[in-house]
């Protein structure tokens, strides 16, 4: 009997398919694989270590981070490399350079490359031997360099405190021989600074002894025999940390480093040194708790050499403005401004100001009001001094201002003393003396260019105020309005470009008129509105409003077609025959187009016309445009000049009939592009062609913008330049919360 079994291949083909499940071959998270290499300098830092000839210089190992500690991994690596296990080894990672410990072994990931090296204790012992010997400068430089490389590694620093002492580095700073080697000294200072900043154990900046502070201070005050850039940078940075770190070390620094000795570093060609010196100045002033000492430090910077040093290095013409330097200069200037005398003005100082305006016929009541306001002015003596200086140094300008003011009609004049006080308020706000947004970062070059910056800027503002008052045609009660506009003008001029001195500022203000500022306002308002229109909320609102606006425009256009328009018929030849016209009108049912011949540009419906044609829109195949040139010289509205004129055409293609296989074409011409566009797009919409709607879309977009801008008029948006007012925390916070 023949076998009925199928061949194997056919059986396999007809067997049901079995889905294979994916197999995860990745290692668990706590299992990592990587490589270990032998450090080439292993025997340098551990002289007892021996690398046998059978040692493997690179091995691959697997670490179980849950079960294995650092010591276990070191032993495993040494065993895999055929190294003697009686030596003490360590594992080192690069970028950043650090020793592997039980605390950071969890940070390793698969693919690591570690270096089997000497242990941290061996490193410290060898460094200590070299530094204590002190004979080979090259070896000392290499030892300190290694310490600097590991100065941010707690493992080596702990070993350093365990096997050596920080006094070893302090001795290097004290040693005059070390100061002759710039590389050794600068590296030592950097390493010492990093170790103190790391603050392992109780060793911090307050651990620095006074004689070391004196030695470091000598490097920046000019007492050192020689100066080098890297050493100077390291010393300046260390002194600043000593100022910040502890009250005792701060007092030592203030005694050993007079702030005026730092001025010479500001004019260095290396801007890093100038920046470090400025940063140290600011820290000395900022952290000085003694008010008298702080005022003394500030007054030491109110000198011409300091201003010249800043101008020659950090504010020189043509140099790029470093943001970090600008930040330091602004802080210096804030300190200088804080020392301005804003105490209440004396009676004699107030009388000097009033005497300047004594030539004008002012009532005794006004004079007494001004006297009181000057005595209570927030800028005090600073304001009265600026006013008196304006009268004494610019008497001709003052006479000119008063003369122009007296020629104005009654009610359109400003009063000198109130105007001066308002200009002082503006100047004080720009300088940060009064609440508001200061402009010190933009005024910095101007302030450092003059001995008396406040009176100089005040003088510019007085002239600007007078000119703006005239251009605005302001009246007596509009002092605040003009002042607000003047402040806005100043901010815009300062923002527009970098100004170097008072003369340049005055010239720029002369060219920036009231009308120019109005134009800027309009541009900013338009830009603000455009930004609002592109926000997500407005875009969402725009999408919701669009269908209603489109429907409104469509109905409006159809109503326009129902009123009807006169069009010119296309000319069959280029002869000078009289132009022919016809009147097109959409039926109220929006299903039929009525075309009536007419004699001229105006259509009069007398009700007795026989030449009326009715075209059903269902018989229209397509509506397109077809422009042509009008070469007729006519005085009608279709040709206002003898020159050629472009006529916009509305081309209506009817469906084919038995008589006309291609369908009849009706053409209507007009010089009015808007009229042609409305007819063409509206008829196209009625016959089912919704693609050609450029004119309609433009009108829809314009109406949408108008609608959105009207809606945004009453929406108050937060000003990004002004911080919102945050109310204080209530005294009884629990009852405040429970009330809700």
From Swiss-Prot:
Positions of region (Required for punctate localization, cell corpse engulfment and distal cell tip migration): 555-690
Principal location class: cytoplasm
UniProt entry keywords in alphabetical sequence: Apoptosis, Cytoplasm, Phagocytosis, SH3-binding
ELMO domain sequence ranges: 348-494
GO cellular component entries: cytoplasm; plasma membrane
Family matches, as InterPro entries: ARM-like, ARM-type_fold, ELMO_ARM, ELMO_dom, ELMO_domain-containing, PH_domain
Location of the motif SH3-binding: 724-727
GO molecular function, one term: proline-rich region binding
Subcellular location: Cytoplasm
GO biological process assignments: actin cytoskeleton organization; actin filament organization; apoptotic process; cell migration; cell motility; cytoskeletal rearrangement involved in phagocytosis, engulfment; engulfment of apoptotic cell; gonad morphogenesis
One Pfam match: PH_12
Entry function: Involved in apoptosis and necrosis. Required for the cell corpse engulfment process. Has roles in the formation of actin halos and distal tip cell migration. Plays no role in amphid axon outgrowth.
Subunit structure: Interacts with psr-1. Forms a ternary complex with ced-2 and ced-5.
UniProt xrefs under PANTHER family: CED-12 (PTHR12771:SF56), ENGULFMENT AND CELL MOTILITY (PTHR12771)
Entry protein name: Cell death abnormality protein 12
Species this protein is from: Caenorhabditis briggsae
Organism classification: Eukaryota, Metazoa, Ecdysozoa, Nematoda, Chromadorea
Gene assigned in the entry: ced-12
């Amino acid at each position: 009997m023949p076998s009925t079994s199928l061949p194997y291949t056919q059986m396999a083909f007809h067997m049901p398919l079995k889905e294979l499940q994916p197999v995860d071959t990745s290692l668990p998270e706590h299992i990592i694989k990587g490589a270990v290499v032998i450090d080439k300098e292993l025997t340098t830092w551990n002289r007892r270590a021996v690398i046998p000839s059978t040692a493997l210089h690179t091995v691959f190992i697997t670490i179980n981070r849950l079960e294995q500690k650092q010591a276990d991994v070191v032993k495993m690596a040494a065993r895999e490399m055929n190294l003697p296990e009686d030596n003490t080894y360590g594992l080192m990672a690069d970028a950043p350079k650090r020793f592997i410990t039980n605390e950071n072994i969890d940070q390793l990931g698969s693919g690591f490359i570690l270096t089997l090296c000497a242990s941290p204790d061996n490193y410290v012992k060898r460094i200590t031997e070299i530094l204590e010997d002190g004979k080979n400068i090259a070896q000392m430089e290499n030892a300190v360099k290694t310490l600097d490389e590991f100065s941010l590694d707690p493992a080596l620093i702990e070993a350093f405190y365990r096997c050596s002492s920080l006094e070893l580095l302090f001795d290097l700073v004290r040693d005059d021989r070390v100061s002759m080697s710039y590389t050794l000294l600068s590296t030592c200072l950097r390493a010492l600074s990093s170790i103190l900043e790391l603050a392992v154990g109780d060793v911090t900046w307050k651990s620095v002894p006074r004689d070391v502070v004196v030695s470091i201070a000598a490097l920046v005050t000019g007492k050192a025999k020689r100066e080098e850039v890297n050493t100077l940078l390291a010393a300046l940075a260390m002194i600043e940390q000593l100022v910040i770190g502890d009250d005792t070390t701060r007092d030592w620094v203030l005694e050993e480093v007079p702030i005026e000795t730092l001025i010479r570093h500001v004019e260095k060609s290396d801007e890093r040194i100038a920046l470090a010196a400025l940063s140290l100045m600011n820290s000395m002033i900022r952290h000085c708790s003694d008010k008298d000492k702080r005022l003394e430090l500030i007054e030491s910077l109110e000198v011409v050499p300091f201003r010249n040093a800043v101008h020659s290095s950090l504010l020189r013409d043509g140099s790029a403005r470093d943001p970090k330097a600008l930040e330091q200069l602004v802080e210096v200037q804030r300190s200088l401004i804080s020392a301005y005398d804003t105490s209440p003005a004396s009676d004699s100082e107030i009388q000097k100001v009033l005497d300047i305006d004594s030539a004008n016929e002012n009532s005794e009541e006004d004079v007494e009001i001004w006297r009181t306001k000057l005595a209570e002015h927030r800028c005090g003596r600073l304001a009265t001094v600026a006013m008196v200086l304006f009268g004494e140094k610019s008497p001709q300008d003052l006479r000119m201002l008063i003369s122009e003011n007296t020629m104005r009609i009654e009610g359109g004049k400003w009063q000198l003393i109130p105007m001066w006080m308002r200009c002082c308020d503006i100047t004080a706000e720009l300088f940060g003396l009064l609440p508001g947004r200061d402009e010190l970062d933009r005024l910095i070059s101007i302030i450092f260019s003059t001995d008396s910056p406040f009176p100089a800027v005040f003088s510019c503002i007085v002239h600007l105020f007078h000119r703006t008052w005239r251009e605005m045609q302001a009246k007596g009660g509009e002092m605040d309005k003009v002042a607000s506009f003047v402040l806005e003008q100043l901010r815009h001029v300062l923002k527009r470009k970098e100004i170097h001195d008072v003369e340049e500022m005055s010239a720029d203000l002369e060219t920036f008129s009231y009308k120019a500022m109005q134009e800027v306002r309009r541009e900013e308002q338009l830009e603000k509105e455009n930004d609002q229109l592109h926000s997500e909320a407005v875009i969402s609102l725009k999408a919701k409003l669009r269908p209603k606006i489109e429907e409104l425009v469509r109905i409006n256009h159809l109503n326009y077609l129902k009123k009807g328009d006169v069009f010119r018929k296309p000319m069959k030849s280029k002869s000078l025959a009289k132009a022919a016209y016809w009147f097109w009108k959409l039926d109220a049912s929006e299903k039929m187009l009525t075309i009536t011949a007419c004699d001229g540009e105006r259509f009069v419906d007398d009700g007795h016309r026989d030449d009326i044609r009715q075209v059903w829109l269902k018989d229209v195949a397509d509506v397109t445009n077809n422009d042509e040139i009008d070469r007729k010289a006519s005085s009608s509205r279709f040709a206002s000049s003898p020159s050629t004129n472009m006529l916009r055409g509305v081309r209506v293609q009817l469906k084919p009939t038995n008589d006309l296989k291609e369908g009849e074409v009706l053409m209507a011409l007009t010089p009015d592009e808007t009229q042609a566009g409305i007819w063409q797009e509206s008829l196209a919409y009625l016959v089912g062609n919704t693609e050609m709607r450029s004119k309609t879309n433009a009108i829809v977009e314009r109406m949408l913008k108008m609608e959105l801008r009207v809606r945004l008029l009453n929406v108050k948006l937060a000003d990004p330049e002004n911080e919102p007012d945050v109310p204080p925390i209530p005294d009884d916070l629990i009852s405040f919360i429970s009330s809700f």
